[in-house]
């Protein structure tokens, strides 16, 4: 689960981090009034979406004219913002953040992730702030400095000072950076973050550190104990198919191929996608129906897969370990009849009662292609998707 910038900054403020005064607004009039409440003669207005690259897409504006703020809000509210991190449809804009303008002398980067390699929370800092950190990591990895947080000792001030020296901070800025680092590290654990970014963390013309932006991703598995964070969820930013799948406890991720995949088990699902790719196909999704692949869940899975107009064929790959393949076959038949599937369906069953399951499919009278192996299934579904 991701948070909007204004939500991230509200958490930053709770932990004593320096952020701009700002208000998230639902209407153009609110945006104009927010500028008046903030005061001054220069403001920044930002579209609130779960995506980076807003500035290049026209979703950020610096202005000293309240009527320009009104025009900006009227233009974007209710529309979709398309950036390099969204699909071609973009993300809907429901709120505009109006903030005081900050005078910038230098831009830095500070972020943290749960690193699978070290199995620790790892902080990253760089002098290359305000740009795509992925490009920095790829082209000049030596400019990214890291601090690994030991879960037994927690974050330590010396780690902040080490990063601060590498960023070239002066003694005053070092103290500020240490406070920011310790606050972020504490916040990361307190709220079960999976990702945290301040890009840019700026040095103002007065020489102070300031959190100019904020990006936070939450571990979805921890939301049961994060009621406050869960209440911040904005469903309008979710993929509609992924949100629908979550209602039925289906793990679904939309992709851009034409072969729909329905599999039980995340590992088998990833392997299925790999073998479809190996045989020249492109998966349209990742979908794990889990161990309890009932008729109802299979039917919903078909509905979700087929809601993607790019899907030209569906591969159902089931290993009968927890469930019997004959029961799965009956569920597939019922789902195909209920949903009215119009594209070719290739089914590969293996495991408990696999042969009986294939017999059930053969006797159904439906146009379902039974595969003898995973390789055969991949070859068949790729051909079907190509209309061969």
UniProtKB/Swiss-Prot annotation:
PROSITE patterns xref list: ATP_GRASP, SUCCINYL_COA_LIG_3
Signal peptide positions (record): none
Group of enzyme by EC: ligase
Keyword presence, DNA repair: no
Positions of the ATP-grasp domain: 9-244
One Gene Ontology CC term in the entry: cytosol
Entry EC number(s): 6.2.1.5
Reported cofactor(s): Mg(2+)
InterPro entries per record: ATP-grasp, ATP-grasp_succ-CoA_synth-type, ATP_grasp_subdomain_1, Succ-CoA_synthase_bsu_CS, SUCC_ACL_C, Succ_CoA_ligase-like_bsu, Succinyl-CoA_synth-like
Pfam families xref list: ATP-grasp_2, Ligase_CoA
Binding site for ATP: 46, 53-55, 99, 102, 107
Keyword Iron included in the entry's annotation: no
UniProt-listed GO biological process terms: succinyl-CoA metabolic process; tricarboxylic acid cycle
Pathway the protein contributes to: Carbohydrate metabolism; tricarboxylic acid cycle; succinate from succinyl-CoA (ligase route): step 1/1
Reaction(s) this enzyme catalyzes, per UniProt: succinate + ATP + CoA = succinyl-CoA + ADP + phosphate; GTP + succinate + CoA = succinyl-CoA + GDP + phosphate
Family: Belongs to the succinate/malate CoA ligase beta subunit family.
Assembly description: Heterotetramer of two alpha and two beta subunits.
Summary of the function given for this chain in its UniProt record: Succinyl-CoA synthetase functions in the citric acid cycle (TCA), coupling the hydrolysis of succinyl-CoA to the synthesis of either ATP or GTP and thus represents the only step of substrate-level phosphorylation in the TCA. The beta subunit provides nucleotide specificity of the enzyme and binds the substrate succinate, while the binding sites for coenzyme A and phosphate are found in the alpha subunit.
Name this protein carries in UniProt: Succinate--CoA ligase [ADP-forming] subunit beta
Organism field: Shewanella sp. (strain ANA-3)
